[in-house]
Structures are given as structure tokens and as C-alpha cells.
Amino acid sequence: GTASSNLVLGYGPFEGWQTHDLAWGTPYAKDLTISFWVKSSVPGIYSIQLINYGTGNAQAFREYHVKHANAWQWCSVTFKGCNSLGTNDLYESRSMVVNWSLGAGPDDRIDESVQDWATTGGNWRGTNDSVEWGAVTGATFQITGVQMETGPVATEFAYRSYPEEVALCQRYFCKSYAISTGPGTNTNAGLRIGRNFDPNGARSDVP
């Protein structure tokens, strides 16, 4: 089994400007639905942890069931709006983190229904019913088509064009040269020329 202090997580942080419309930490908090396609060599129950940072950090878990090994299936989970803790930070601060739990030791597990928008004390990283994917030699886990939506309903995945995706990614990382060109410099008669390719305003402090 997984040791008491061992964790296997997929980590996804979000900035405040991406989440402030959820109005969490207020009486008007909205639900959040996460939908995705998943394929795992280890069937069973898995869990997703949502941590809401801000004034009074809070966390919640939702479980989903991988029914068959090595087969793609669509899943969705809905987190109720957090109206008591974790007022969203705005702008560039880390506001929310989604953890895809693939394994947690017994000291890091809790019942899904118990740990729902409570403070983050205890370092919980999985639910009691979750599989120990990390303890299976050669195990594989794949997700794609992840979509987060305001409200309790998951809709069809909204595809974006390649230029749109590139522009969004360049907020966090951008090559010093064009995408199709390897980074480097040119030298001519002692003159060294470099290029800084930054078409979009990059975030200076990645969460």
C-alpha cells in the first residue's frame, strides 16, 4: 500500500481573475462543475480535491468511478459553491488549486462527505474509498478534455483554435524566438544579436 506520508497528485493552480466570478466566500457563491475524459489501467474510485485559497482556506473532495481498465470514459463532478470560507483572491494571486489524487497514505485520507468546505488543516489529499494507483507497478493514468464551468451542469467540451491556445499559454511561458525557430543568437563582426519574443503580457509570478 501507499506509505502514510506518500502522495501522488496532479496539480493545477488558477489565478484569481479566472475564478472571482464564482463569488466564493460570499452568500452568492456559485457551483463549479469539472468534466473530463479519463483512462486508467487501474479501475476503481478516484477523487478530486479542490482547495479554495484566500481569506480562510477551504477544501472539498468529489469522487468519480473509473469503471473499466484502459478504456476512455467521460466523467463530471460538481462542487457546491463555497459561501463561508475562502474568499477568492483577485488578479494574479493563486486563488484555487485542483488536485487529481492518484494515491494517498492512510494518514492523508478522509471521507468525502466529511471534508466538504472545511479548513485545510490535516493535509488531506484523498478519500477513504480511493484506489491506491501509486502502489500499482506500471500503472497508467490519462486525462483530456478537462473543462471547468460555473453551475451544476456539464456541457459539451468547448474547443479553441490553436492560436487561441498558444496565446493563453504564453501568459506563463514563451520562447525567446518564434515557435518554429530554435532559440539562439547571431554574431557579426563582434555584434551579438538576440531576440525576445513576447507577444502577450506574461505573468511575472506563476502560481
Where are these regions (language model features)?
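Extracellular and organelle-lumenal recognition/adhesion modules and their flexible linkers in secreted
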Residues: 1-207
